[in-house]
Amino acid sequence: MKKNIHILGASGVGTSTLGAALSKRLPHTHLDTDNYYWLDKFTKKREIPERRKLLEKDLTINEKWILSGAVCGWGDNLKSYFDLVVFLWIPQDIRLERLRHREFQRYGNEVLAGGSKYEQSKTFLEWASLYDNAGMEVRSRALHEHWMADLSCPVLKIEDDCSVNERVDRVLDYLSSN
């Protein structure tokens, strides 16, 4: 059984959801990079050395874990911790619709024109829309593919829009056969 699993992909693809679901089926602690990246959720970033220190501490004190979210660019030193990387991808239109829905669930009417979170949400969604076609300068598929290319662990790619349960089953099937 792989002890340390990292799940990454674009914002809105379901890395946190899959991590949480897998942790209910495996004896693994679920950790999410957002809890290390953000000092104040989605508004103020933590300094990189502090992020690394906090995350590395949790990776070492937990015997088995699932880490959801991306560490590309700030946590490259953690690659050796991973026994399996799961890469998720779904079509952009589905992903952006999920993000719009999540933004509304999180902030309500404040994300609509004239609301206090409108500009922040608009900027976030514009950034998220770059994922499939942007270069290495932002969180993008190109950056993730480049980052995964030199991993020493296996990479399981799930590149279609399927249910959380189907994703869990694919990961569990992979783990049982490898």
Swiss-Prot record:
The keyword Membrane does not apply. Residues 1-19 form the signal peptide. The keyword Signal applies. Keywords: Signal. This is Uncharacterized protein YqaC. It comes from Bacillus subtilis (strain 168). The lineage of its organism: Bacteria, Bacillati, Bacillota, Bacilli, Bacillales.
